Amino acid sequence: MEEKKVDLKDTLNLPRTEFPMKANLPQREPQILEKWKGLYEKIQKERKGREVFVLHDGPPYANGHIHVGHALNKILKDVINKYNLLIGKNVNFIPGWDCHGLPIERAVEKELSKKKIKKESLPKTEFRELCREYAKKYVNIQREDFVRLGVLGDWEHPYLTMDPKYEAQEIRELGKFFERGLAYRSKKPVYWCIYDKTAEAEAEVEYYEKEDPSIYVKFPLKSGEKFGIKDKKVFAIIWTTTPWTLPANLGIMVKEDADYVLVEVEDEVWIVAKELMDKFFETVNRPEGLVLETVKGKDLVGLEYTHPFVEKEKLKGHLSEETLKNMWKIYPSEFVSLDTGTGLVHMAPGHGQEDYVVGQRYGLEPYAPVSDEGRFVEPAPEFLINVRVFDANHLIVGVLKEKGFLVHEEKIRHSYPHCWRCKNPVIFRATPQWFIGMDIEFFGKTLRQRALEEIEKVKWIPEYGKNRIKSMVENRPDWCISRQRFWGVPITVFYCENCGEIIKDREVFERVAQLVENSEKGSDVWFELTSSQLLPEGYKCPKCGGDSFTKEEDILDVWFDSGCSHAAVIRPLGFQKADLYLEGSDQHRGWFQASLLESVGSYLEAPYKAVLTHGFIVDEKGRKMSKSLGNVISPQEVVKEFGADILRLWVVSEDYTEDVKLGKNLLKKIADDYRKIRNTLRFIIGNLYDFNPRTNALPFEKLHHFDRWIISELQNLLKKVHENYEKFLFYRVHNHIKNFVITTLSAIYLDVLKDRLYVYAPASWERRSAQTALWHLLIALTTSTAPYLSFTAEELWEHVGKLDPSLPESVFLYEMPKPDENLKDEEVLKDYEILLKVRDEVMRALEVARKEKGIIKHPYEAKVYIRGDESVESLLKKYEDYLNFFFTVSQVELREGGEVQIEGEELPVKVGVNKAEGEKCPRCWIYYQKEEFVGCVCKRCAKALSEMGIELNAVC
């Protein structure tokens, strides 16, 4: 019976792995999530006692599904946390949610309106319960979305700003501000939303383009005698884009040291700033009049005028005697600019921050005859009563025109503050509010001074963030912390009904905090219990001894809510401050600033060591994502089509410090990069199926020089990877890894290595050396990509664990290798720097031989001739025995020759190519002379077969 022949192909060590080529991420990732259940807790247990890295999560708002902005933010945080895990630290990451505030109130009101129920008809606590349930619902929805992205954290115990413990700590924090004299109540102008009927913080205001009337108005001076003008009426000319504020005008401001001109215009005299005169007359489309006199701003101070359409008599009984005495005069102000207008600025202390400051200086109260809904009320002129402010503009312009006080009117498009929730324009309106004073001293310094000092101690990434927040803190007004709404933490102060004293004792705050903490529904107790039930038993007013008290009805600004998170979340765990806060760049005026001011006011220090910001997401054309443009991409959609790892790879592929582009074409390109990386990792693990790193790995010094080269290059890569992870430059991490995988590994190392892996006997030195290098590569690449390609790294790790069962069950319980100088061969690195350049020249020559001359079809069909200068030639001689494998050709001779000849472009070498001599070995495909064959295969293959126990006659 004829003996069955062994197929030569079956004698090759071809790759074998169960790690699939097709990722199928959308289907595979949920299986990995199952495996990760309990991983965060296991890490906490195993890493106990290690250095802890604390990234404090800025709480997203518990409303709606997550969008790609949320995904970008949480993935960036996750990459940082996982890198810190992989360098051996313990990581504390407690996700949080912002649960109070107007958007939730609005959403609940909308639901109620469907049932024809008005919010006002429900008890406050019942409405608050509906808000609580709404927030819970979206916390759960968003939590699922974040977990699906592969974000690791304590998802079972997140912090919620509506949690009773959190609210109680917030009340204690508030108490400190009262105790230190930093919190006060005052009537002053604040941003006011007339649609939501509440005050707003600076951070809650967004600027959009708005069209408004731009008008120039004549205010008649009572007399021009100071300038010797008796026979003509003298007018101060003001410019405004908010005509609706004119009913509240109490003064005109000028720049003391600026020049002003008195200009004769027909039978009148107009006063404008000299510097703005030409521009003014051009704008109002009138010929310039005769300048009668030039005076300084200080010469105008004290002059009295009459209001174009408001009668003083009607204000009596509504305004204080002091205001009535000081109103309608010209006052000096440092806020007057000579950039636009006339240099004379209409002042309404009830409708502008700067106007208010000057008004306070000169005894003018913040008068604002406007209701919560933005409608004019008494004592505004009769024609305006019950009219909305923005609707009043054209009525006021009409009256000015009719009375002859309108100089000019046009339309202007300008940037105007809008409510971040309802997107409607807001107004500045003086109402009684609670404030935290930026310039009140405590412990020898003001809150502003301390905050600015702390900013200097924090690391800001990118650096421009420092100047941004610094200028905001330098210029910000006092912090308005009160809101006229239902769903939030109450401002827990009482008023004595007998003497009006504000009760703000520490023991009172502590008593309320304890009641809140011990109630299932937290701060609802404030609305459920009476003052006497909330106050300590037998409490008396410290001023008059009274025992009847009224509760404050306002609630706290949600920025104070989230600004307390360091005190409610980080400090109770024993951490003085977080290592890092990371949010979008809009949070310099939002959470970063609120947290800074709250922490400095409470603990005299910043709550963070470093602050990192990212940009916003735009489409591939750089446009903002919007439903109207149809360019919105949801993370859920990306995960469903591509998988979360593709979204994660997108995050690290971009420079997130700028605005980040996202679109389907970009995602396809990212998916293509992913495939290249995955296939390379698959090839590596596929060639380790018979390798036991514990018993088969060789020491570095005993490795083949080509393997020593790649491991040396790997140390260089690890150095760059660690450096850029530490600097949060993830796009550089990814670029370095991607280039290494695609260029250094796929195109060079692994391509050359195939011969050694496939042809030599499985346990040969040549193959074990190659496998040792592959093992180093596998561990380094799996761990260094794990922070961002988390699902893929974990999937791969399951296969890695089969090769070495002593490894931990998850890649995130292992440590990423650090660059090791003992695994670097500088001589080999230097040699290969030249050899690779020679290889490039050889590849170029082979391409000419294949494409242009048709001499060869495959590189193994080639014989290569190389001639170089002395230094190149001596290097080539050093590695002569390996050159044909390195160039993937059959033969190499160090002399001139060949049918195809090219001159080196980068090196002084000549490369020639001829068809290889001899015959092709059917097993390794390399050409040898007849005498180099044993039977039907070359001597090298014959040796390998012998070591494998395969007799030649079984294959030949």
Swiss-Prot record:
Could you tell me the gene encoding this protein? ileS
Cofactors needed by this protein, per the record, are: Zn(2+)
What GO annotations for molecular function exist for this entry?
aminoacyl-tRNA deacylase activity; ATP binding; isoleucine-tRNA ligase activity; tRNA binding; zinc ion binding
Top-rank taxon of the source lineage equals Bacteria
Q: Which reaction does it catalyse?
A: tRNA(Ile) + L-isoleucine + ATP = L-isoleucyl-tRNA(Ile) + AMP + diphosphate
How it assembles, according to the record, is: Monomer.
Give the motif span ('KMSKS' region): 624-628
* Primary enzyme class: ligase
Q: How is the cofactor bound?
A: Binds 1 zinc ion per subunit.
Q: What is its EC number?
A: 6.1.1.5
Tell me which family the UniProt entry assigns to this protein.
Belongs to the class-I aminoacyl-tRNA synthetase family. IleS type 1 subfamily.
Residue sites binding Zn(2+) per the record:
921, 924, 938, 941
- The protein's name is Isoleucine--tRNA ligase
Q: What's the stated role of this polypeptide? A: Catalyzes the attachment of isoleucine to tRNA(Ile). As IleRS can inadvertently accommodate and process structurally similar amino acids such as valine, to avoid such errors it has two additional distinct tRNA(Ile)-dependent editing activities. One activity is designated as 'pretransfer' editing and involves the hydrolysis of activated Val-AMP. The other activity is designated 'posttransfer' editing and involves deacylation of mischarged Val-tRNA(Ile).
GO cellular component terms given for this protein: cytosol
UniProt keyword terms in alphabetical order: Aminoacyl-tRNA synthetase, ATP-binding, Cytoplasm, Ligase, Metal-binding, Nucleotide-binding, Protein biosynthesis, Zinc
Q: Which InterPro entries match?
A: aa-tRNA-synth_I_CS, aa-tRNA-synth_Ia, Anticodon_Ile_BEm, Ile-tRNA-ligase, Ile-tRNA-ligase_type1, Ile-tRNA_ligase, M/V/L/I-tRNA-synth_anticd-bd, Rossmann-like_a/b/a_fold
Where does this protein chiefly localize? cytoplasm
**Domain comment as written in the entry:** IleRS has two distinct active sites: one for aminoacylation and one for editing. The misactivated valine is translocated from the active site to the editing site, which sterically excludes the correctly activated isoleucine. The single editing site contains two valyl binding pockets, one specific for each substrate (Val-AMP or Val-tRNA(Ile)).
What are the recorded Gene Ontology BP terms?
isoleucyl-tRNA aminoacylation
Binding of ATP occurs at: 627
The entry marks the following residues as binding L-isoleucyl-5'-AMP, namely 583
Compartment(s) where it occurs, according to its Swiss-Prot or TrEMBL record? Cytoplasm
Question: What taxonomic lineage is listed for the species of origin?
Answer: Bacteria, Pseudomonadati, Aquificota, Aquificia, Aquificales
Q: Where is this motif: 'HIGH' region?
A: 60-70
